[in-house]
UniProtKB/Swiss-Prot annotation:
Function: May protect the nitrogenase Fe-Mo protein from oxidative damage.
Annotated gene: nifW
Protein name: Nitrogenase-stabilizing/protective protein NifW
Keywords: Nitrogen fixation
Entries under Pfam families matching the protein: NifW
Domain of life: Bacteria
Source organism (scientific name): Azorhizobium caulinodans (strain ATCC 43989 / DSM 5975 / JCM 20966 / LMG 6465 / NBRC 14845 / NCIMB 13405 / ORS 571)
UniProt key word Cell membrane: no
Family stated for the protein in its record: Belongs to the NifW family.
Length: 109
């Protein structure tokens, strides 16, 4: 069962991506994390949002969080932030510009 001071509390108090990797004992390349740290943590959050940890043992929660962080990290080893588009600004950059409304000149007569 999750307890105060458990892994979720520790992750909530973590102040850097490196803290997440250390707490969950996930190996990483510092050069990769320096470039895409926010993207990795955002993706991890996207994966975890559908998880329900209520009533689970802290070891099980830690193992699942580790799997999710490893997957989020792997996502950005295999592709770029522009391809993954985890942030709104990058999602919107992929959309073509909306056409400007046109008024027919014959309507103006």
């Amino acid at each position: 069962m999750a307890t105060a001071g458990g892994i979720l509390d520790q992750l909530n108090k973590a102040s850097s991506a490196e803290d997440f990797f250390a707490l969950l004992e996930v190996d990483y390349d510092p050069q990769v994390v320096n470039v895409v740290r926010l993207h990795i943590l955002r993706r991890m959050g996207q994966y975890l949002v559908s998880e329900n940890f209520e009533g689970q043992a802290d070891d099980a929660i830690r193992a699942r969080c580790k799997e999710v962080l490893e997957q989020a990290y792997a996502d950005f080893l295999a592709s770029s932030p522009l391809q993954e588009r985890v942030f709104k600004v990058l999602k919107e950059a992929a959309q073509p510009p909306k056409p400007k409304p046109m008024v027919s000149l014959t309507v103006l007569k």
